[in-house]
């Protein structure tokens, strides 16, 4: 029966001390695919190390440690089930990882769970101006995660106070509104990740709370629309030569469907080749769909002709093309000085890493409302949002964010850190000089 349930990717946002690991661990522990034996083993180790109070977070820590050591653990460990859905937790431990995962993410999050701590120091730290939590919420919204649930955590540390809950709810709700969420429709749930209050069952310690439990709230989310019906796009993660088979590009299907027999183009190059077979986890697939990480065999193409960052598409259905310029909305997160025209940092978009030049800063815009506040500003700095015209220094395949989200969002990197994030609005194609995008890039 379980097969018919829709899969939803859940990104958990929260300050390191918000208790998000304990909350997530507790849910996975109660509803997930962790077998009893594993849990008992973890509990025993946890007790021996005197970490009894971190039991649920410990579950997650162990999974992370095993994952980081390269032990392939059953992905079911990161899943939990509600009456309507299978949820997969996309956990992003650190700030840098969070930004990286949100942009080039192994999977696009459909829903965000924001965990904020109710304890006095905790909330102020997590939700201060400098707190990364706010930035992560803004990033999630900018990158298309429009559904969010808020867990007001550690209620056990404030004696399950309704006043404290209301105070936090007001502040977080105001911020969500500013960012652009429909805050009146967002569930704010008083929880204790450790004690389990209002996670799965209603707690008798919060008789004043009449709303849903965390799981009930997650179960009311709208299922994601998977882009099966869009033209095919597969950003290549690598290209391998396999004895007896030949050239095998590897990547994740972002949109569309791939079947053997299709004639593929590898943009931005002019290489065209027929797909002979498609495999996932060593099994031959009749068709690969969005979200599938696959390898596929192509005829008469050498490993030297195609590479990571190229995008495979169907020659007969709106094939991908290289792009000579594009305009994008960027949010500057972290730059020590000012960014002016001519700045040329590295751009990470899907699997490609290419230097791009800021041709022109077209306008500075209000992050919240999207309205233009200044035309052609001389410079932009941390905290600013702007519309900019960019030029890749090498041929590059990108798409508009509205048409192909995974190929239309990017991170700008410089000085070994993420300087900005952006989404692409308009393209100028490299196609015999013709502009085939929906709207030409601003000059």
From Swiss-Prot:
Entry-linked SUPFAM superfamilies: EF-Tu/eEF-1alpha/eIF2-gamma C-terminal domain, P-loop containing nucleoside triphosphate hydrolases, Translation proteins
InterPro entries xref list: EFTu-like_2, G_TR_CS, GTP-eEF1A_C, P-loop_NTPase, T_Tr_GTP-bd_dom, TRAFAC_GTPase_members, Transl_B-barrel_sf, Transl_elong_EF1A/Init_IF2_C
Superkingdom, natural source: Eukaryota
Gene3D superfamilies xref list: P-loop containing nucleotide triphosphate hydrolases, Translation factors
Record: residues binding GTP: 14-21, 91-95, 153-156
Region (G2): 70-74
Region annotated G3, chain positions: 91-94
Keywords on record: Cytoplasm, Elongation factor, GTP-binding, Nucleotide-binding, Protein biosynthesis
Residue ranges of the region described as G5: 192-194
Record region (G4): 153-156
One Pfam family cited in the UniProt record for this chain: GTP-eEF1A_C
GO cellular component: cytoplasm
Main location, first listed in the record: cytoplasm
Subcellular location: Cytoplasm
Keyword GTP-binding: yes
GO molecular function term, any single one: GTPase activity
Region (G1): 14-21
Protein task: This protein promotes the GTP-dependent binding of aminoacyl-tRNA to the A-site of ribosomes during protein biosynthesis.
Similarity-based family: Belongs to the TRAFAC class translation factor GTPase superfamily. Classic translation factor GTPase family. EF-Tu/EF-1A subfamily.
Name of the featured protein: Elongation factor 1-alpha
